[in-house]
């Protein structure tokens, strides 16, 4: 019996196995503002990695957690220069620790996002960007914004949504802004969830919807602890979940073609 024919594969193109996956990028998290929402970031990120990779996979991440008592005091004193220095320091520490990119796990402290981004050599994933992209992908134009008074009243967040993404952003009136802000700082950051506060938020949301809001941005990472879809007649966009999932998207992104060639 003759030997079976042998076919050389030399020079042949191997089957396309799709984009080569890199080792997970290291997610750097600036947390503690408050730790209640930072815990949600950690939970969502690791759950998402496990869901995508299977088994007992989890995220490669670092967290620098600040003392929120000090942060809250400086916020209400209006000492944004010192707050900026602290956020820059946290980002630099994460970069030195091996983070590949950084998240500020809070909406309010994105007031100094540009300064933080300028202080490091790795990317800062801005919380407003994936949120706005989700809203636009869903076909909404006019949105209501809930958050701390700093987030609702200053331009750093609302202005970014309007200028960069072309959204029309509504904020509650002065009385409703005070209610939203006080519930965040007096209850949610301490892990207190009260039915009467949920009802108050429902009323604020209803007034925004009556003013034309097609969707509501939960623009404080603690608000998702209090309200859910059943509290609103229009879709809610939870910035905590959106930001955390965007971090996983980046951490698990396929290796760019140039990087793939260099690794071969």
Q: Could you tell me what each predicted segment is?
A:
Residues 17-264:
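Non-catalytic structural scaffold of enzyme domains
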């Amino acid at each position: 019996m003759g030997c079976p024919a042998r076919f050389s594969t030399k020079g042949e193109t191997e089957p396309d196995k799709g984009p080569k996956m890199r080792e997970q990028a290291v997610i750097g998290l600036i947390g503690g503002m408050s730790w209640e929402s930072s815990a949600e970031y950690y939970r969502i990120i690791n759950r998402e990695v496990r869901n995508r990779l299977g088994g007992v996979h989890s995220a490669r991440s670092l967290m620098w957690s600040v003392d929120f008592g000090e942060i809250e005091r400086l916020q209400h004193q209006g000492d944004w220069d010192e707050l900026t220095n602290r956020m820059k320091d946290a980002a630099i520490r994460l970069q030195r620790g091996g983070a590949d990119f950084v998240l500020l796990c809070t909406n309010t402290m994105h007031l100094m996002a540009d300064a933080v981004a300028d202080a490091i050599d790795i990317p800062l994933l801005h919380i407003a960007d994936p949120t706005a992209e989700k809203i636009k992908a869903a076909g909404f134009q006019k949105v209501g914004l809930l958050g701390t008074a700093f987030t609702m009243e200053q331009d750093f967040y609302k202005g970014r949504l309007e200028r960069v993404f072309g959204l029309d952003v509504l904020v509650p009136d002065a009385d409703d802004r005070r209610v939203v802000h006080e519930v965040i700082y007096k209850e949610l950051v301490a892990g207190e969830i009260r039915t009467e506060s949920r009802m108050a938020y429902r009323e604020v949301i209803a007034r925004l919807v009556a003013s034309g809001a097609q969707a509501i941005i939960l623009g404080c990472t603690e608000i998702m602890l209090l309200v859910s879809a059943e509290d609103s007649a229009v879709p809610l966009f939870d910035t905590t979940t959106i930001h955390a999932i965007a971090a996983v998207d980046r951490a698990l992104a396929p290796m760019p073609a140039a990087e793939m060639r260099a690794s071969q």
